[in-house]
Amino acid sequence: MTRGGPQRQARASEDVAAQLMKSFYADGLKPGEWVGTEATLAERFNVSRVTIRDAVSGLAARGLLDVRVGARGGLRIASSDPERLIDAFSIQLRLMGLSREELFEAMLAIEPVTAALAADRASAAQLSELRDLVEESSRAADDLVTFTSVAVAFHHAVAEASNNRALRAALAPLRATQLEHLAPTTTPAIAQRVVRAHADILAAIEAHDALEAGNRMRTHLSVVSHAPV
């Protein structure tokens, strides 16, 4: 193989992958729709099967394509799987060594909005889950490891109750980092304050008071962010 061969092959595969993505989006393809085989795509883009195979592998790893084998095999647009993105992003955040300050800046940017939306959109089942989490956190206030896990779960349940998939997906990768930063600094006194704050946020959500729910969440996060570490 000539010098630069692997690099040229990689660049060619990346170029084809970008073209494939652009083509799929332009065609408005939906999850489950058939897009061809390696052979048909290689012919369509006038590249080798190796180049197409590498491009397809990359797009499959990124969650865009589903590669199927057998008599009904071929390439299809993959079904939506936000958990795949969430897991990958969570790992990257942990590798970055996200600081406590950065974590709370992100939470303050997202969570007052999710609380306000939850006040307008939460279903009866979602409100019931929020009540259960507030009650569970109150019972666990003396078990700080369990308490922290339940308290973080409350915040993510509020995001679920916002019924906004983009905001939910933005917050979800922070969960592991939240546990890492909050668990070591939570005291019984802090736990009791958090329980009261969560109950107040829930009350505003139940009252369908979006402005107050957002304000209470913002105040709560500001107080916790300045707790001694």
Regions found by a protein language model. Give the residues of each.
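Short linear motifs at protein or domain termini
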Residues: 1-108
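Short loop-to-helix capping motifs
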Residues: 37-38, 162-165, 208-209
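DNA-binding alpha-helical recognition surfaces that contact promoter or target DNA
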Residues: 54, 169, 215
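Amphipathic alpha-helical regulatory segments at dimerization interfaces
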Residues: 58, 157-161
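All-alpha effector-binding/dimerization core of bacterial HTH-type transcriptional repressors
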Residues: 79-157, 193-216
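Short, charge-rich, low-complexity alpha-helical interaction segments
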Residues: 160, 165-174, 178
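C-terminal all-alpha effector/ligand-binding and dimerization domain
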Residues: 172-229
